[in-house]
Amino acid sequence: MREDRLFARFVEYSFFAVFAALIVSYALDKLFGTSLSPLLVFLLTLIPAIGLILILPFSSRKTAILTVAVLIEMAVALYLAFR
């Protein structure tokens, strides 16, 4: 049960972090007139990835395997976005 609450907190905090990153990047986009879409892709992938890496020691074996699979998917998404 503790693990479920930990994941719920992670999802909640990462949502707020990504939402704040979207607002800041939109404001910078309007202020400077530049496109920040590569930065957005990086932030939208990096913030949840850091949270998943930090939560990995507290998860069970099945959840850890799923978490590693999600991290691999995020790495592939970053590679495809910036190649």
Curated annotation (Swiss-Prot):
The residue ranges crossing the membrane are: 7-26, 36-58, 65-82
**What's any one GO cellular component for it?**
plasma membrane
Annotated localization? Cell membrane
What is the topology of this protein in the membrane according to its UniProt annotation? Multi-pass membrane protein
Q: Which UniProt keywords apply?
A: Cell membrane, Membrane, Transmembrane, Transmembrane helix
Q: By what name is this protein known?
A: Uncharacterized protein AF_1524
- Recorded source organism is Archaeoglobus fulgidus (strain ATCC 49558 / DSM 4304 / JCM 9628 / NBRC 100126 / VC-16)
